[in-house]
């Protein structure tokens, strides 16, 4: 397992260096990633500083629920294509399957590397929310435990969603001749959503804060797991345990399903 993880990590870094037909040093790649993350963090710090108004309204759980939603969305968006490439389009899939290695071991070695990437995106959204809450309201040991366990659960949940969506992407791309069209469509959609959110950020935030109580009622009624995530991050031990079990359970279920059909899917 350890050797498989090393191979997958080296292979992923090699493909990143070769993307676009140009060689780039590892230091340059790391530098670009750090720069992008710093830019994201600055935006999120400003965002969560404004969103602390929910905490003053007695809706601390909603503040953390929104943090969980954003973390999950960012992690899935940032990791889904890498997951699809690493799990289903890796060139050594058939070679590894021909060896006395169980499909679950192959999957786990690759997911271990992917979990690091998913964790980076997840924490990029959660840490600013945690920091702003701590700065304005302080923290307790119980809240910190809730933060740690909830973050771990969201990372597992995000990776499970990425694996499922990666399977769908693999199935679609295997039936499309011009794969560049899919990449172009994805890029255009991303730019449209990005510029819409960027140009309407102030209005969206204002509407969100004005509708806080209505949103809270809707979440409690129709999306209880999100309420549980928010309560767990707010220090509620039962909700923290529920969130942890949910994330681990979904990840285990998806991993089992993928392992059972892995050989058929990639060959």
Task: List the model feature ranges, each with a label.
Residues 1-93, 103-267:
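Hydrophobic alpha-helical transmembrane segments of membrane proteins
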